[in-house]
């Protein structure tokens, strides 16, 4: 039994490492592109919102905390919030309108043109995240998806999509939080270490 348990550990680590290496070989440029857009969003005085369910809700809260507090360097707090944390709002909307609208209504209330919404879903099909992305598009909020399994319904709603094309939920989640950490680090890099990279875009050039 001990040998079997050890094998489970090693197989998970091996498969996770293979998927991680393949993912970042294919998507490194997309991660950098999104981090640049996050930095521009914040440099323009806008905010980043996050939403998801279950483990993805935990990721949403984790990443919002990294922006508001700090990541790896000392720097000013950055405006970010998770739409998963207020039990009164979540239960009021869920009770009166249904769980599908718990993020949508918050985006309608809080989202402003130029803000960003990051929806996290390992399936890409979470109804409440899908509706939140639709609401964001209606309000001129930049839409981002962190998904698995090809992106699902979210793919068509996202200005930026980081999809882990795999059906193993734990491995998808592990890459999501790694991507999130890289986005935090790179956003800090653009805002506080390489601000010259932002200047052309702040002066009117559209990101490529």
Curated annotation (Swiss-Prot):
Pfam families per record: SIS_2
First-listed, main subcellular location of the protein, grouped into a coarse class: cytoplasm
EC number: 5.3.1.28
Record keywords: Carbohydrate metabolism, Cytoplasm, Isomerase, Metal-binding, Zinc
Protein function: Catalyzes the isomerization of sedoheptulose 7-phosphate in D-glycero-D-manno-heptose 7-phosphate.
Subunit structure: Homotetramer.
Protein name: Phosphoheptose isomerase
